[in-house]
Amino acid sequence: MTVGRRLNDEEAIPLTAKEAGSRDSIDSSSTASVSLTLVDGTNHTTAKPSKSAHKGVSRDRYADEKYRDDVEEDWEEDRYIPSNAKPSQRRTQIVFWLLVALCVGGWAVAFLFFVTSPGNTISTTPDTGSGSPDSDVIKPGSPPAGKKIPLDDVLGGAWSPTQHTISWIAGPKGEDGLLLQKSEGGTGPYLHVEDVRNIHGTQSNNKSMVLMKDSVFFVNDERISPEKVWPSPDLKTVLAMTRQKKNWRHSYTGLYWLFDVETQTAQPLDPGAPNGRIQLATWSPTSDAVAFTRDNNLYIRNLTSKTVKAITTDGGANLFYGIPDWVYEEEVFEGNSATWWSLDGKYISFLRTNETTVPEFPVDFYLSSPPDYAPKPGEEAYPYVQQIKYPKAGAPNPTVGLQFYDVEREESFSVDVKDSLNDDDRIIIEVIPGSNGRILVRETNRESYIVKVAAIDATKREGKIIRSDNIDEIDGGWVEPSHTTTYIPSDPASGRPNDGYIDTVIHEGYNHLAYFTPLENPKPKMLTTGKWEVVAAPSGVDLKNNVIYFVATKESPIDRHVYSVKLDGSELQLLKDSEKSAYYDVSFSHGAGYMLLQYQGPKIPWQKLMNSPSNTDSYTEILEENKRLAKLSNEFALPSLHYSSITVDGFKLPVVERRPPNFDETKKYPVLFHLYGGPGSQTVNKKFLVNFQTYVASTLGYIVVTVDGRGTGFNGRKFRCIVRRNLGHYEAYDQIQTAKAWGRKPYVDKTRIAIWGWSYGGFMTLKTLEQDAGETFQYGMAVAPVTDWRYYDSIYTERYMHMPQNNEEGYETASVSNSTALSQNTRFLIMHGSADDNVHFQNTLTLLDKLDIMGVHNYDMHVFPDSNHGIYFHHAYKMVHQRLSDWLVNAFNGEWVRLRDPKPTIIKRVIRRLLHR
């Protein structure tokens, strides 16, 4: 599941997220991106703290209300007094003295409450239990007396690390270590290729090549400013796109142009339809053709002529060629492409998606509509309705099939694969082009526990299943879509007599790298083993030296380090000079001779370019040190992070506790639990991150705890797969048990514990409140929650729950339906965007109806008109977080306790009578 992702919004990560920073149905990156190179949509954030950070507006807002509830005084002015009322002097005096008496009495009660309340008793007993969070403590460099963090700074990206995204590119003759760079400042050529060792362009280098001198070009006197560009593999032509128009999370349309590097001139990709909006365009590996999809049909343009040939002609509202539909884009490919060229450029593989039987779901827009939408006369007052083909759990899925196009013969064909899954039970999750017309296809059944790998020979037009696994029989789990399977071509001179591929497989209860060779061999050579897991591997492959690079959790499930291993499984090595407790990421050049190493935490992030271990040409350059962020960290008071674990039912759960600056163990603190909790996700890690949770601890002065319960990732398959068929049960139990443990700590006020989450985290918030029934958690805040998995999309839901037809009891149990249990909590908050195309507003409305039926009213509700799952429309994103902050302060100040059973007081009635005489 995904949501549009913004800066520092791991609380809103998509349901499909594999780990906190990887993606958002809430989009990801949690960092600002500064691009020296060309990436899709470059971005440079140089945000500074808002003025309020220096004026201290937010700093003291709740300074007197951090650790105790205010006692409510019932002597407010009666708002129903008529504006022209004139009470006598005697009555006024009576009222005055009554008010004075009430004030004195109220203060006395408040003082008595403060000194006797169990939430304010002073404890001198230190926390020395086995679950002490002091086992791994990260304290910021800032002084505890530093400034508090304004919420606007967090939401605005001032605390986002500056991050450079490198666009590695292979040279025309396979040269390694080349970058694609774009100059935004008007100095130097607009688009050029540079050697990584000359990234700043200060040296003369024969590998440098100018592709586009200027940032604009003209076609028939029309001024063109490219928004995205893709050079051909031979670097002689640039495919440029303008007038981008967003579709779904990853997809868009635009006008495409072919720019000739030698003449610096351009022409439309399709001269016959220059204004036709194209959905996808991809280069042939031989640079002589472009395949593209327009109006859901696939075309090919050969650069030697200006003619365009249609590969398909029946595409339309229900048939897609070469691009995914909504659910495949969202849950399978996580991108906009379903077109793959063979490595020799002779064949095109493309997906045919048929949505005819998929039901539609209407999304209403009350305040907005597409720019080209014009209502019929007299219908201006009606909402714009967007119909989405959205397969919910148990409903018909789109049927998909892989088709092929022979470029030389100009003909399309299909390949029958014996023992392949049936059309109505197939999800194609990955297509891997190989050499000599070979293609690997990974497919799963609808419930994602059968995985098959087919090898197809497009030249012979035949294929067969070369591998089949039943995950249900292995560990009762499921298969996640992945896009990292890597084809390894044969090279006898380098010790590779046969073609093969590297895949991530289940080995002794953990995800590990395996090398399958020859191609048809179902029994692999294990490249990694142990009680740890590889992450989106491999990251790079050095075919010259037979070295594989990957990121893994070998040091700790919450750390990430870079490793290398030989293709024969020998010489597993940690990257030299790596810090023991750290979170690294890496991207490699085309031949894996160079890499961009990214240190992402726990200290201030940095980036550097360097040669890979298998490259003897030594090179290192610091690309980013984030000095601005280091300066901020020394000016503002950040919470300290205390990493630990808690054992529940024999499972060791990772925990991070954020303690406020100036933390005092003799005081009692409220605690906010924040969670996501989706299958395979991870929220507890060693990344540097200043987000809403940081703000709550730093500025509001509350403790914030996050625990990754069962079902989350990187702790082994047993830990992850226990939630199969029963989402919400074990995850909620783990949150409750952790909260109980924290409630026993001497510095925690167990009468003030809250929980909150977004998307899957919103679902988990409500399930936790439901299962706990007010025993441990008093408050909860759920944003865009799933409340019934029958309402969510089929591919995601059935992967973990099976189809409703095969797990009716599980779906019933997993729904948020126990209104009586929810009524036992002090109060909870629900927020949702009305135009959420991912987690439909239907989820929240259904829950509200259940609450109405049972007469439950201890909740607040906020609807954001026309906002999708990310909740942005009309400044809604800021409103969400401000509402969360204010609501939480009111909760911990005791406001919701007062509202739980509202009754007029005798004193108010007496005052009302006196004033109305």
From Swiss-Prot:
GO terms for biological process: proteolysis. GO terms for molecular function: aminopeptidase activity; dipeptidyl-peptidase activity; serine-type peptidase activity. Residues 57-69 have a biased composition (Basic and acidic residues). GO terms for cellular component: fungal-type vacuole membrane; plasma membrane. Gene3D superfamilies: alpha/beta hydrolase, Dipeptidylpeptidase IV, N-terminal domain. Keywords: Aminopeptidase, Glycoprotein, Hydrolase, Membrane, Protease, Serine protease, Signal-anchor, Transmembrane, Transmembrane helix, Vacuole. Residues 1-75, 124-150 are annotated as: Disordered. It is a single-pass type II membrane protein. Glycans are attached at residues 206, 302, 354, 818. Residues 1-93 are cytoplasmic. Belongs to the peptidase S9B family. This is Probable dipeptidyl-aminopeptidase B. It comes from Arthroderma gypseum (strain ATCC MYA-4604 / CBS 118893). The gene is DAPB.
